[in-house]
Amino acid sequence: MTPELTRFGEEMSHLTGVRAIMKDIIETLQAGQGQLLINLSAGNPVILPEIEQLWRDCTQALLASAEYGQVVCRYGTSQGYEPLIAAIKDDFNQRYGLALSDRNILITPGSQALYFLAANAFGGYHATGRMKDIVLPLSPDYTGYGGISLVPEAVRAYRPTIIQDEASHRFRYRPDFSQLAIDENTGFVLFSRPCNPTGNVLSNADVEHIANLAAAHNVPVLVDSAYAPPYPALNFTAMEPVFGENILHCMSLSKAGLPGERLGVAIGDPAIIQVLECFQTNFCIHSSRYGQAIAARAIASGALAQLSEQVIRPYYQDKFAVLAAALDQALPQDLPWYLHNGEGAIFAWLWFDQLPITDQELYQRLKQRGVIVVPGHPFFPGLRDNWPHTRQCLRLSLTASRAELAEAATRLGALVTEVYRAPPSQSGATPSMAVPAR
């Protein structure tokens, strides 16, 4: 049966971003069973023994409690499981000196669902018929943002400033405030901090500047804090959440070891929370109460924050250091390659300036050498101009073993050297690929 789809149905029934590439990656992994394939594409967190044990302990406590039946055998409120809301409120008030009430917090079925709710509550066509943009102020950013709106043309990203250190082969992105437009045509602003895929951590000053620009037009700012402190605390540089009247602090417990339970948290102004809660009631009623109940125990006890700092962060920070050292050794110093500063998250982001082939071609040729990465172009959702930089980057996951990361860097270095050294006719270069990235 092939029912006719609406315009929205057509939009939402297609895979976007990395999810479209994952089909090819899965087929490659299945076809390559028995081969030595190094998979640096994964977004799933590593199952760390201490973290798994925490969730086992919290589950055992829930099973033994008198409230078990009330948690899993009954519906709850759309706002979320009350003990979890209380645990988050108390922790944030104590940790950051806030004065949150229960009405400042909403629990959602994952942070992706939260951004979908916000995108379609604040972005797109308003009652007057005017389009309100969903502004991504720092591109590249999370590929999933490309699929959150029922009105895809509402998503608008801005090219960043690139800060290079040629001697160390490092770089980082920063918002280009001379180009960034947040005005009466903006519905809301969204960015990740730390950033997936780059690991970039926007400074407090930059976050506050974005929030101030938005506040002048009564525009909410959603900060995707899926990798931020206090849990999972996947920041490798000092940072704290930034709060403000128009800032919605958005968390996920996926990288804290609960991706299967789909738990997102929004913290912000009650007026914004109320809109999203009503949307969620119509959308899915509420998030899984089982996941909320075990999360409430982990947060209230302090165990989740402690293990995030003592186990989760050091694990991935060490992996980044291993990969960075291996890349420094494997990639020639005279080639224009740059590794984004390791500021957080579970990925490394590589830029090959003036790359003679596209990132998609590099991805395909790396597969032939037994290394699976993610090409960078899906991480520029909403970017309107034709920027060669979008076809010059790769995302590498830090979930592989130390030995696999080192071997992958060696294979990548050999291939990239061949690509840059080859005559244009052999490298597959095209004029559009042979121009500087800026």
Regions found by a protein language model. Give the residues of each.
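N-terminal small-domain helix-loop-helix segment of the aminotransferase-like
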Residues: 2-5, 11-110, 166-178, 299, ...
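Conserved glycine-rich beta-strand-loop-beta hairpin in the small C-terminal domain of fold type I
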Residues: 39, 310-324, 336-352
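Conserved PLP-binding active-site segment of the aspartate aminotransferase-like
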Residues: 41, 268, 349-356, 373-415
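Short, solvent-exposed loop/turn segments at secondary-structure junctions
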Residues: 43-47, 112-113, 141-144, 194-197, ...
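Conserved core of the PLP fold type I
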Residues: 70-217, 222-243, 248, 420-438
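Conserved core segment of the aminotransferase class I/II
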Residues: 131, 150, 243-317, 329, ...
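Conserved PLP-binding catalytic core of the aspartate aminotransferase-like
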Residues: 335-370, 436-438
